[in-house]
Amino acid sequence: MGINMLDELKEDLVGIDIRFDEPLKRYTYTKVGGPADYLAFPRNRYELFRIVKFANKHNIPWMVLGNASNLIVRDGGIRGFVIMFDKLNGIAVNGYQVEAEAGANLIATTKVACFHSLTGFEFAAGIPGSIGGAVFMNAGAYGGEIAHILVSAQVLTKDGDIRTIDARDMRFGYRRSVLQETGEVVISAKFNLKPGDYEQIKHEMNRLNHLRELKQPLEYPSCGSVFKRPPGHFAGQLIMEANLEGHRIGGVEVSTKHAGFMVNVDQGTAKDYEDLIADVIAKVKENSGVTLEPEVRIIGDKLN
């Protein structure tokens, strides 16, 4: 960006929290990721629209990062604007419906539902990430998923327009939605729940959280579940059968607590993650004949 455009950015986007050449590893669950050219934290939709309008006017690429939980940002970082929705995190309850902004924490949203004795969101009680990312990926666990409860989502198009997509038009599948094809960004979502008993809902949430603590390597940075579940198999079991528990490249290793996870144990890099993922896919294929498909998204530029 030239000096004149940089001055225009500072003038047009005055008052918005924008950080230049900001390392993204400070914000990712993996603790890896190179710099964003411009990392923006809009406080409301008006600031969001200003950022997108400026970026589109100057043909600067932009994307939303979300909570960066099921994501690997490459070591070369991301060009253009990276927009964080941390401050767009409102949650409201209207009858049996919960509406949340895209930056709302998924776990916090389940707690709000529980407080209002609304059942249906318990499956997500321990899933890290944001509402926007959860809708984008059709997040799920323990038999539940976003597709079961979503009513509609407001999305931002690449042109900066807003439209509403009903759940039936989301084309939900296993860890997928139509948004992965259109590139549209969730800015809020509405969920339909059912009345329930507060103590029973709380007990179920605590039970699922306890299971996660027992089975998942929460003590290390990670990108969550690395691979999709292959039909008729479990990814973690296939990885164990290939004797890959503890298998390590650089600072990243296959978790010995849950082989479906890869953990950053010693200042690992995104390249370590990518190399380990590729190695595990190859060795599982050789051992079982099954080709694992990554669930984690990998974005950004590689280092030259």
Curated annotation (Swiss-Prot):
A single GO BP term for this record reads: regulation of cell shape
Q: Where in the cell is it found?
A: Cytoplasm
Q: One GO molecular-function annotation for this sequence?
A: UDP-N-acetylmuramate dehydrogenase activity
Q: Which NCBIfam families match?
A: murB, PRK13905.1
What family does this belong to?
Belongs to the MurB family.
What EC number(s) does this enzyme carry?
1.3.1.98
UniProt protein name: UDP-N-acetylenolpyruvoylglucosamine reductase
Provide GO CC annotations from the record. Answer: cytosol
The FAD-binding PCMH-type domain covers 31-196
Give the catalysed reaction(s), semicolon-separated. UDP-N-acetyl-alpha-D-muramate + NADP(+) = UDP-N-acetyl-3-O-(1-carboxyvinyl)-alpha-D-glucosamine + NADPH + H(+)
Q: What is its pathway?
A: Cell wall biogenesis; peptidoglycan biosynthesis
**PROSITE patterns, sorted:** FAD_PCMH (PS51387)
Please state the gene responsible for encoding this protein.
murB
Keyword NADP on entry: yes
Q: Which domain of life does the protein's organism represent?
A: Bacteria
Keyword Zinc-finger annotated: no
According to its UniProt record, which residues of this chain constitute the active site? Answer: 175, 225 (proton donor), 295
Q: What class of enzyme is it?
A: oxidoreductase
Biological role: Cell wall formation.
